[in-house]
Amino acid sequence: MPYLLLFALLFVLNTPLARAASCPHWNPQQAKAEVAQLRATLARWDEHYHRQGIALVADELYDQSHERLNHLQQCFAVGTSPSPLASARGPVPHPVPHTGVDKLADRQAVARWMTGKTGVWVQPKVDGVAVSLTYQQGRLVQLTSRGDGVHGHDWSRHIPQLGAVTRQLPEAVDLHLQGELYLRLDEHVQAKAGSANARGTVAGLLARKQLTGAQGNAIGLFVWGWPHGPEQQAERLAQLARLGFPDSQLYSIAIDTLEDAAHWREHWYRSALPFATDGVILRQGSRPPAERWQAKAPYWIAAWKYPYAQALAEVRDVRFRVGRTGRVTPVLHVQPVTLDDRRITQVSLGSLARWQRLDIRPGDQVAISLAGLTIPRLEHVVHRAVERQPITAPAPDQHHAHSCWQASEGCDEQFIARLTWLGGKQGLALPRTGPGTWRRLVEAGLVTSMTDWLQLDAERLQQAPGISRLTATQMLGSFDQARSRPFDQWLRALGVPIGKHLPLTGNWQALASRSAGQWQTVPGIGAKRSRQLVEFFAASEVQAIAAQLAEAGIEGFRTPPQRIEQ
C-alpha cells in the first residue's frame, strides 16, 4: 500500500497543476506568441547546424532552450514541436538506427537509473558528431551522419582525408560501427577549457564539400557502438581494441555504484583528455539485439552531463544601483540558476551604456557564465521576450560626483552609498555602521545629511526599526570615535578625490584655497586630478558639510582663532 501512495503522489506532482507554479503568467495570446518565436529560433539553429555545419549558439544554450520549449509546451498545452533532428534527415539509411539517450539531471536521477541494473559501464560522453561507419573486407567504405537516427547524409567523400580515423582494419571483416567524430585536442581539461566549440568545429568541417589533409587529420574517432558485436561489453571492447579502436576500451570502466559513476565523471571532467566531453555515458553491458533498436532513448543507456558553463536565465527585473560617485550600474535579477554549484540570482551589467545597448527587459533569456569561477557575468541575450516591458532608468546626467549629498527624492541609493563609504574601512572605519544600518537610519528620517548622525542620541536611534537599546549604545560609541579621527581621514571619508597614499596636510581652509596649479605641485597629482580636487573643495554641498563639521568641533574643519597683535 505505501508504494501505491508514493506512486500516486509522484503522479500528482508531475501534473500540469503541480508545475503551474513555475509557469509564466501569460495570457493565451502571449503564450502562443512566445512559444512560436522560440520554435522559430530553434528551427533556424537546427537548419544552420545540420545543413551548413554552423553552430549559431553554444551547445549547452541550445539544450537549455529546448528544455525551456518543452516546459512551455507543457505549461500552455500548445502542442509539441517537430523533432530537432528533422532538418538533419538525409537520404542514406543507417544499417541500424542510432538510439537516443536520456539525460539524467542529478545524482538522484542517476541513482534511480542504476537501481536494479547490473553490469553497468561508464564512458566519457565525447562532444562531437555521431556517425555510422561501414567496413567491407576491413576497409572503411561508408560514413553516414546520424541525421534523424534512421536516415543521414553521406560523408564518405571525406574518408581519404581522415588520417586519424582507422580506415583499414587488420582483418578483412565486414562490420558496422557507431561512434563520434571529434576534434582532436591536446591535454584538454573540460573543467578549465569548456567545450571549445569542438562539436561545432567538426560539424562545420564535415559540412564542406572537401577537406584538406590537415583538416581531416584534426578529426578523431571514438567508437561507442557495435550493434552486431559480442553480447557483453567487455568482449566487445576487447575485440574493438584488436581491430584498431583502443580508445573504446581505454575509456570504458565497469562500475557497481553511484559513487563509482560520480568518481569517473569528476575524474574525466578535471583530467587531460584528447577530446572535449560534455558528461559521461552510462550503459548496461548487455543490450537487446540490434534488430530491436529504434531512434529513441532506450532503457539501457543514459547520460549524466557536466555542469553547464553557461546557464540560460530568465530576467525577472532590471534594477539600477547608484554608487557613491554617481556611477549607475544596472543589475539583472534573474530566475535562480546554478553554475558550478553556485546559485545565481543577479548579474551586473557594468554600465548604463551597456544596458542601453543591449536593451534587456524582464522576460528576456540571457546567457550567464562565471568569471574567474566566482563572479556571475552576462555573456549575451539569447531570446528576447515578445512583449517588451517598460523600464524606467535614471537619466544619464541625474547622478554625478556632486549629486545626492542629502536624502531627497531619487537620491536614496547614492546618499546611502556615501554614508557607507564614510563609515567603512576606506573612511572613518566605524564599527556597526554597514549599509543596512545607514539605510534604516535614512528610511526612519533620522539621517538626512552627511552629519546628522553626530547629533543622535540613544533614544532617537531606537526609533529606527531593528535597533535595540544595546545596539543604540554600541552605535553611539562608534559615533563618538569618529570625533577623534584625524582630519585627513575625515576628508577621505567624504570622498576627496585623491589617492590613499598621497598626503593631505593642513586644514580645511588651506586646502580649499588651493588652485589647480598648486595641487599639481604635489607629486602624483596631474591636471585631471587637480581639477577634480578644486571642484570638490568648491562644491557648495561639500562646503556646507565642512561648516557643519566645524560646528561639531571636528579637528581641521574649525576656523583657527585669530591672533590679536598687542
Swiss-Prot record:
It comes from the Bacteria. It is an enzyme of class 6 (ligase). Keywords: DNA damage, DNA repair, DNA replication, Ligase, NAD. The keyword NAD applies. The active site is at K125. Its EC number is 6.5.1.2. GO terms for molecular function: DNA ligase (NAD+) activity. InterPro entries: DNA_ligase, DNA_ligase_B, DNA_ligase_CS, DNAligase_adenylation, DNAligase_N, NA-bd_OB-fold, NAD_dep_DNA_ligaseB, NAD_DNA_ligase_OB. One of its GO terms (biological process) is DNA repair. The keyword GTP-binding does not apply. It catalyses: NAD(+) + (deoxyribonucleotide)n-3'-hydroxyl + 5'-phospho-(deoxyribonucleotide)m = (deoxyribonucleotide)n+m + AMP + beta-nicotinamide D-nucleotide. It holds the Pfam family DNA_ligase_aden. Catalyzes the formation of phosphodiester linkages between 5'-phosphoryl and 3'-hydroxyl groups in double-stranded DNA using NAD as a coenzyme and as the energy source for the reaction. Belongs to the NAD-dependent DNA ligase family. LigB subfamily. This is DNA ligase B. It comes from Pseudomonas putida (strain ATCC 47054 / DSM 6125 / CFBP 8728 / NCIMB 11950 / KT2440).
